[in-house]
């Protein structure tokens, strides 16, 4: 980050280059239209920056033209930093060359990072980028200068960290709180931010894993309890057990498990009733089919008996007709031939005819 600002500060400041840039015609290029909200954020860029941030935003995707209205880097050691801080955050920076310039180039680099962060917090728009203040601090401090750490649990560092969070979420003041102190305090505050941020993330990570582990254990225990309740009663026991006995056995269990078990019992009973009805229907059908076969065989036997009796009847009828034809002329001729009794007159008629024959 400091290297980018240094590169922006080393732009040519000769009058010839400034005149060339001012005479350059930009109207022949098409202008990319941006929404009003994006334009409002783009106008808040500090002059002299190239907007080449590692995080791509609608404004930073197209680098803005450099402005040479800022004071040249040769005017003083800390004038550039103080001027940019005054324009970005609205608060005057420390005077250049004063006792605040401690640490040489390293302190200046850290100050430039802090001023860049405070001036760009409106442009980054963490709500649109789904970023948190912790991510912004880590991106800025992690890519800059790393000094000696003075402890993660320092009260002043925690207070400054909370103040930075409030500023980032409220979208207000940039360098009022962070650039008002001397350089050495800002340097220590930045490193305290870094260490406290890492400690906070480490603690949050372990707490989240513990929470997930506890949730998994609780889910496993609930599944085991559910399996134990399901395996406690077999299907035959559920079907044969009375409602009163089942309610007595289910005391102490949750309502959802009791409802699930009773639904299973109702399903088993309905299934058993349907199976018994199906079995009874099949059994009755087999019985009726066997009776039908027996009746059909009896009908066939009766038909055969009827045919046999009809044939016997025809034979007797034919014999009777023969006897009747032969007995008619014998009766008319006299008593030379005894009358042969017909089959219909057998019995008492025959007993009557015997004395007549001998008489």
From Swiss-Prot:
GO biological-process terms attached to the record: insulin secretion; positive regulation of DNA-templated transcription; positive regulation of transcription by RNA polymerase II; response to glucose
Bias-annotated ranges (Low complexity): 46-73, 343-359
GO cellular component labels: nucleus
Family matches, as PROSITE patterns: BZIP
Positions bearing the Glycyl lysine isopeptide (Lys-Gly) (interchain with G-Cter in SUMO2) cross-link: 32
Post-translational modification Phosphothreonine, affected residues: 53, 57
Location in or out of the cell: Nucleus
GO molecular function: DNA binding; DNA-binding transcription activator activity, RNA polymerase II-specific; RNA polymerase II cis-regulatory region sequence-specific DNA binding
Induction: Up-regulated by glucose in pancreatic beta-cell lines.
Sequence segments annotated as region (Leucine-zipper): 288-309
InterPro entries cross-referenced by the UniProt entry: bZIP (IPR004827), bZIP_Maf (IPR004826), bZIP_sf (IPR046347), Maf_TF_N (IPR013592), TF_DNA-bd_sf (IPR008917), Transcription_factor_Maf_fam (IPR024874)
Effects seen without this gene: Mice are born at the expected Mendelian rate and survive until adulthood. They show a normal pancreatic morphology at birth. A 12 weeks, they exhibit a reduction in the proportion of Langerhans islet beta-cells and impaired glucose-stimulated insulin secretion and eventually they develop diabetes mellitus.
Recorded family membership: Belongs to the bZIP family. Maf subfamily.
Function text: Transcriptional factor that activates insulin gene expression. Acts synergistically with NEUROD1/BETA2 and PDX1. Binds the insulin enhancer C1/RIPE3b element. Binds to consensus TRE-type MARE 5'-TGCTGACTCAGCA-3' DNA sequence.
Protein name listed in UniProt: Transcription factor MafA
Gene, per the UniProt record: Mafa
């Amino acid at each position: 980050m400091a290297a980018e600002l240094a590169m922006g500060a080393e732009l040519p400041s000769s009058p010839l280059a400034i005149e060339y840039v001012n005479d350059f015609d930009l109207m022949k290029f098409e202008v990319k239209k941006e929404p009003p909200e994006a334009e409002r954020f783009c106008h808040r860029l500090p002059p002299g920056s190239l907007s080449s941030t590692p995080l791509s935003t609608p404004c930073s995707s197209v680098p803005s033209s450099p402005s040479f209205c800022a004071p040249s880097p040769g005017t003083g050691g800390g004038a550039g930093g103080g001027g940019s801080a005054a324009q970005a955050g609205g608060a005057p920076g420390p005077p250049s060359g004063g006792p605040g310039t401690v640490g040489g180039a390293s302190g200046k680099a850290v100050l430039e990072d802090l001023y860049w962060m405070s001036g760009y917090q409106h442009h980054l728009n963490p709500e649109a980028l789904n970023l948190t203040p912790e991510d912004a601090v880590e991106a800025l401090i992690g890519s800059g200068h790393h000094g000696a750490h003075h402890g993660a649990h320092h009260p002043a560092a925690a207070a400054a960290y909370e103040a930075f969070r409030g500023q980032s979420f409220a979208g207000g003041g940039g360098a009022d709180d962070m650039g008002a102190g001397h350089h050495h305090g800002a340097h220590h505050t930045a490193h305290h931010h870094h260490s406290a941020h890492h400690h906070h993330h480490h603690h949050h990570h372990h707490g989240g894993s513990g929470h997930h582990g506890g949730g998994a254990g609780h889910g496993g225990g609930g599944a085991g309890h559910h399996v134990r309740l399901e395996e406690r009663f077999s299907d035959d026991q559920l079907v044969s057990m009375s409602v009163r006995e089942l309610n007595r056995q289910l005391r102490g269990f949750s309502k959802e498990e009791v409802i699930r078990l009773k639904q299973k019992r109702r399903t088993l009973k309905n299934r058993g009733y349907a199976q018994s009805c199906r079995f009874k229907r099949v059994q009755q059908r087999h019985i009726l089919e066997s009776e039908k076969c027996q009746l059909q065989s009896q009908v066939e036997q009766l038909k055969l008996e009827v045919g046999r009796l009809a044939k016997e009847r025809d034979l007797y009828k034919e014999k009777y007709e023969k006897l009747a034809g032969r007995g008619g002329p014998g009766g008319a001729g006299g008593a030379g031939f005894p009358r042969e009794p017909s089959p219909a007159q057998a019995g008492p008629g025959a007993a009557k005819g015997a004395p007549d024959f001998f008489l």
